Amino acid sequence: MASELAMSNSDLPTSPLAMEYVNDFDLMKFEVKKEPVETDRIISQCGRLIAGGSLSSTPMSTPCSSVPPSPSFSAPSPGSGSEQKAHLEDYYWMTGYPQQLNPEALGFSPEDAVEALISNSHQLQGGFDGYARGAQQLASAAGAGAGASLGGSGEEMGPAAAVVSAVIAAAAAQSGAAPHYHHHHHHHHAAGHHHHPTAGAPGAAGSASASAGGAGGSGGGSGGPASAGGGGGGGGGGGGGAAGAGGALHPHHAAAGGLHFDDRFSDEQLVTMSVRELNRQLRGVSKEEVIRLKQKRRTLKNRGYAQSCRFKRVQQRHVLESEKNQLLQQVDHLKQEISRLVRERDAYKEKYEKLVSSGFRENGSSSDNPSSPEFFM
């Protein structure tokens, strides 16, 4: 969109010093009163601007107030080929910055604006068709959800009526009726998207300007692709609504990503992966998801440790039982040896006693034979 603005308005100043000079001042804070002698000239000038479609495409320029005009304000040449596109871009900035359009400074009522816009509606229709095609491509990259919600209330209005509603919304915002329009826009937005009802509220500080900008963005959409362009046509207010919608959708997207994040790592990968590798894989993930995955990893590791301890205990019990069986077998073998030795001892003892008894009988015939029992030992 910035490139189209640069192409359509080739006479804008390209010096960064001039743009910095304009941006450093808040032109709404000066509160310069208009001169009464210049009332007729200003009203006629504004009438020519509305009829000719030459509002400045720079947001900071306020050609219809008594503030010194911006260098970017200049009427387009009559023979330029981009005249219809300039019409559309001028209305785009007018709906995006309603705080610049002070009805007291313009000096005409909303009825005058309606007549001026209806008289120039045939030129606006041709420029709006070209703008809708460019806005459709922009909405496909930025997300058509917020644009469709902003364009929901403008499906039944034509392009001229949409710009008229934007002008009336700007006048109502300046006169103190901004809460009503903000509530109306919020109602349509909530009806269009139930999953983020708080989207479209840019903040308390710029609620009046954002509500008027949102109304202008909603009026900018007429039908299929133009409804997506309505969100971009809202300027500052529509952009704030889209940002709010993105912020409201962010937790849902994070939750949806978290549902499929467990499929990325199996239980075995979580257990075997090092802490450094896991932290590298979890970059850009929400804190709650990181805590949940690390808790799951700790639970799996504790479960594996408990299983290994149980296996070791069972294995050790089997080893001890096998050793016990071996020792029992050895004890039985020793008992058998003891019983065999006892039997041998008894046999030798019985033999000894027989020999001792036979030796006393033969002791009378041969005295040289030892008669002591130790002889047989």
UniProtKB/Swiss-Prot annotation:
Query: Which residue stretches belong to region Leucine-zipper?
Result: 320-341
Q: Which SMART domains is this protein grouped with? A: BRLZ
Q: Name one GO molecular function term.
A: DNA-binding transcription factor activity, RNA polymerase II-specific
Q: Which domain of life is it from?
A: Eukaryota
Where is this protein found?
Nucleus
Q: Where is this region: Represses ARE-mediated transcription?
A: 126-377
Give the compositionally biased regions (Gly residues): 213-244
Q: Where is the composition biased (Polar residues)?
A: 363-377
Q: Which PROSITE patterns match?
A: BZIP
Q: Which GO terms describe its biological process?
A: lens fiber cell differentiation; regulation of transcription by RNA polymerase II
Where are stretches of biased composition, namely Basic residues?
A: 180-197
As annotated, the Glycyl lysine isopeptide (Lys-Gly) (interchain with G-Cter in SUMO2) covalent link is placed at 29, 33, 335
Gene3D superfamilies, sorted:
1.20.5.170
Segment forming the signal sequence: none
| Stretches assigned to the bZIP domain | 292-355
Which SUPFAM superfamilies does this one have? Answer: A DNA-binding domain in eukaryotic transcription factors, Leucine zipper domain
How is this chain modified after translation? Ubiquitinated, leading to its degradation by the proteasome. Ubiquitination is triggered by glucocorticoids. Phosphorylated by GSK3 and MAPK13 on serine and threonine residues. The phosphorylation status can serve to either stimulate or inhibit transcription.
| Quaternary assembly | Homodimer or heterodimer with other bHLH-Zip transcription factors. Binds DNA as a homodimer or as a heterodimer. Heterotetramer of two MAF and two USF2. Interacts with PAX6; the interaction is direct. Interacts with MYB; interaction takes place weakly in normal T-cells and increases in T-cells following stimulation through the TCR engagement. Interacts with MYB; the ternary complex formed with MYB and the CD13 promoter is regulated in response to differentiating signals. Interacts with USF2; the interaction inhibits its DNA-binding activity on the L7 promoter.
Q: Which family does it belong to?
A: Belongs to the bZIP family. Maf subfamily.
Which purpose does this protein serve, as stated in its record?
Acts as a transcriptional activator or repressor. When overexpressed, represses anti-oxidant response element (ARE)-mediated transcription. Involved either as an oncogene or as a tumor suppressor, depending on the cell context. Binds to the ARE sites of detoxifying enzyme gene promoters. Involved in embryonic lens fiber cell development. Recruits the transcriptional coactivators CREBBP and/or EP300 to crystallin promoters leading to up-regulation of crystallin gene during lens fiber cell differentiation. Activates the expression of IL4 in T-helper 2 (Th2) cells.
Name of the protein in question? Transcription factor Maf
Ranked from the top, the taxonomy reads: Eukaryota, Metazoa, Chordata, Craniata, Vertebrata
Task: Provide the gene name from the record.
Answer: MAF
